[in-house]
Amino acid sequence: MQQNKTVSQQKTINPVYWVPTAYFAMGLPFIAINLVSVFMFKDLGISDTQIAFWTSLIMMPWTLKFLWSPFLEMYRTKKFFVLVTELLSGILFGIVAFSLFFDYFFAISISTMAVIAFSGATHDIACDGVYMAELNKEEQAKYIGVQGAFYNVAKLVANGGLVAMAGALAEYFGAIEGASLEANKGAYSYAWMIIFAVIAAIMVLIGLYHIRMLPSNQIPSTTKKTTSEVGRELVAVIANFFTKKHIFYYICFIILYRLAEGFIMKIAPLFLRASREVGGLGLSLKEI
């Protein structure tokens, strides 16, 4: 009786209470790693080559997440993975924040961000799964705009508000625009530590909020599949995908359609921050 009551209560949770926060939590780690970290590493003296290479490489989990998506069905519920990945990402962002004063901060932070990327990609899979499982087709159509809007709100908050806040904090701690790296590094380290601590706190708070507010009427599957069985099914699906007519034309279109945007997304922040002496625009974080 108590179980039936709990399920009934979960069914009454209005999507407006969890769809915005779930998709905000989906967008925040992606933007923090893909764009915000570029500004941080630039301010802390990492070379453009290393920034472009490593921050691009650690984004691969979002491209390859389909490879482990089927395996999530073998363990627990989708809500479980949403909660774990949100809380884990929050903790790891905290590690990034407090690693900035170590001598090997770049190695520590970039490796930690690689784990966050895997966690964030897994969160995407599980979050979309909750959305599809908990809402009927009419509700999915109704809230499709909400999920897209709050994913983009995360972009504005992270790449807009938090970057500007980093600039204001750096000035507060004594950074002088155009001064040497040695003169400004301490101020920028404190500023970016606070920014990534804020991101960490947001992710943890959303995770705690979702413990109660994220619905989960899913019952873990009683039919246990082995890893090899799931692997064979995945290979079969991929093989079938490539048998579709004109599939290689479609793949080429998908890759080329946003190829230029993909290149400029990573390099543009470096160009905006680079001094005019080396061909950049020399903009401050607040101006960007």
Regions found by a protein language model. Name each.
Residues 24, 92, 104-123, 256:
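Hydrophobic core of transmembrane alpha-helices in multi-pass small-molecule transporters
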Residues 82-105:
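C-terminal ends and interior cores of transmembrane alpha-helices
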